[in-house]
Amino acid sequence: MRLNRRDFLIGASLALLGTAANKKLCAQTPADVRLEIAPLKLEIAPGKVIHTVAYNGGVPGPLIRWPEGKPITIDVVNQTDVPEIVHWHGLWIPSDEDGALEEGSPMIAAGGQRRYSFTPRPAGFRWYHTHAFAGHDLKRGGYTGQFGCFYIESKQAPSVHDQEIFLTLHDWNAYMGGGGDASMDAFYDYATINDRMLGHGDPIKVREGQRVLFHVLNASATATHWLALAGHEVTVVGMDGNEVPQQARVPAVRLAPAERIDLLVEMNRPGVWVL
């Protein structure tokens, strides 16, 4: 069959319309998760307000809990006036979905959005955060409230516990200080567990004899933290999302930036204790 120019143009137009329709259909298909990046005024204690950028109006961002091996779609909407990007820390996913510029992932333009599609693995405690370069601006990148926990549920038998609690550590109002070799060190005015300073958060209520599994993330840009639960020892069952080959009971743990730890605690001493 001979194809004249008019028939070709009609066919090409229909193909373009079909492509546009497919794009529109994809845009209308709801994602499994939606993250909105936007400025936030965060009150970490009475009278202490942090001006930052966060996901979905809170710090940390929403917990993403997803079965291992099940595909997921995540829409990220950038409601700031600068380009942004989201990195899925600890996941084995294609480089263009990874959310790291050095791996080839594109930035999300100011006012723009992007859909990430991948299959989360491996199982364990992962997290997501901005991968935008802060440079000399200590109110951008990892210094902001752009972080959240991503827990990939294992296909294997789950651990035995009575409660499961996610905690994130972060530091705020960074500034450069020191002198000599320390002139490039970052210092901070405030530190928080989740979104509150120590002494201003809601208490964690447990019953005597319960086994509580804590998932703790150090989301600070540069600060290392020590963590202990007064009156108790903690059992380390996982590090950076992976089960440890041999569990260990310790009085305290040390977390460098971006490190995660899974701690099992037997609540065997009634009273009020400080974490």
Predicted regions and their residues:
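A conserved active-site cap/scaffold subdomain adjacent to cofactor or substrate pockets
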Residues: D262, M267-V272
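Acidic-aromatic/histidine active-site loop/patch
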Residues: Q163-R211, L217-A221
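Cleavable N-terminal signal peptides
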Residues: K24-L25
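N-terminal secretory signal peptides and thylakoid transit peptides that target proteins
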Residues: M1-L16
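Histidine- and aromatic-enriched segments that form or immediately flank copper-ligand environments
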Residues: T29-A157, T222-R254, V272-L275
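Short, well-ordered beta-strand elements within core beta-sheets of diverse protein domains
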Residues: R114-F118, I204, I261-L264
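A structural feature that tracks compact, well-ordered secondary-structure segments
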Residues: H215-L217, H225-A230, L264-E266
